[in-house]
């Protein structure tokens, strides 16, 4: 089903209105000492079925903008032969995005980073089999996250990997981790080699994690940090898909099981 991107904007406005209107009721509920029993979430397409009686004047105003956005979003830039899911402890899609980050480190140094890292929360949809459109990538990577290349000692890298293990895994590339089902790190190697406490390693990640968010406080101990201007994760992934398509290469990824 084609997604109406113009309606996404109105969908966000509606969501904002609902948020504001619910603030008072949430505050009142707190007085009665309610407790949250369960939280669930799922992807909901914001398409024409939510707007069966569109305002004619609004449609006329938005029409030229909608056509421009649709032309851009529906552009097919590649094709995937397999469906790539996201999820812990690791997944095809998360590891692929981490590899794109790792390779993108060549923008600030003469080789890929030793490790690539992306958090599962930064990926908001799967990569389905079949055509890949610009809109597909926007659905997967809706945030304005940018590349950061961090340089850190082996001791701090181990702390980073321990944090990743405690989260039951994240999207990684260039490393191999063995973790238990309860989030304990058993072993880790970089490029097939044990981690040297005194060696400096480079980690390509996103600015959100580089700032210590997502339980990645170990990044705050980094010896160096370079975040090239304009290198958004979404832009890097779009470039990757286009380059693979131009070279007639398949989109591949690797994922292993937890210990």
What positions do the PLM features span?
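Hydrophobic helical h-region of N-terminal Sec-dependent signal peptides
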Residues: 10-14, 18
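Short coil/turn segments at secondary-structure junctions
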Residues: 11, 81-85, 144, 221-224
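C-terminal motif of bacterial Sec signal peptides marking the signal peptidase cleavage site
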Residues: 20-22
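Feature captures C-terminal
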Residues: 26-47, 95-98, 102-106, 110-253
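Hard-cation-handling environments
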Residues: 51-118, 126
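A short, hydrophobic C-terminal helix/tail in secreted or cell-surface proteins
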Residues: 254-259
């Amino acid at each position: 089903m084609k997604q109406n991107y113009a309606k996404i904007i109105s969908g966000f406005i509606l969501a904002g209105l609902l948020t504001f209107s619910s603030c008072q009721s949430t505050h009142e509920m707190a007085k009665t000492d309610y407790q949250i029993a369960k939280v669930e979430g799922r992807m909901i397409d914001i398409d024409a079925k939510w707007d069966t009686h569109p305002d004619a004047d609004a449609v006329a105003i938005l029409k030229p903008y909608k056509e421009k956005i649709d032309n851009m979003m529906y552009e097919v830039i590649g094709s995937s032969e397999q469906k790539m899911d996201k999820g812990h402890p690791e997944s095809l899609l998360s590891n692929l995005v981490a590899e794109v980050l790792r390779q993108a480190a060549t923008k600030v140094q003469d080789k890929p980073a030793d490790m690539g890292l992306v958090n599962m929360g930064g990926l908001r949809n799967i990569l389905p089999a079949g055509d890949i459109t610009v809109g597909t990538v926007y659905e997967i990577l809706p945030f304005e996250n940018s590349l950061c290349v961090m340089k850190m000692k082996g001791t701090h890298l181990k702390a980073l990997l321990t944090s990743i293990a405690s989260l039951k895994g994240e999207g990684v590339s260039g490393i191999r981790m063995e973790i238990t089902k309860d989030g304990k790190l058993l072993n880790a190697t970089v490029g097939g080699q044990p981690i040297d406490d005194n060696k400096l390693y480079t980690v390509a990640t996103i600015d959100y994690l580089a700032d210590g968010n997502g339980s990645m406080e170990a990044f705050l101990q980094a010896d160096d940090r370079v975040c090239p201007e304009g290198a958004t994760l979404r832009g890097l992934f779009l470039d990757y898909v286009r380059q693979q398509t131009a070279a007639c290469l398949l989109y591949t990824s690797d994922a292993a099981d937890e210990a």
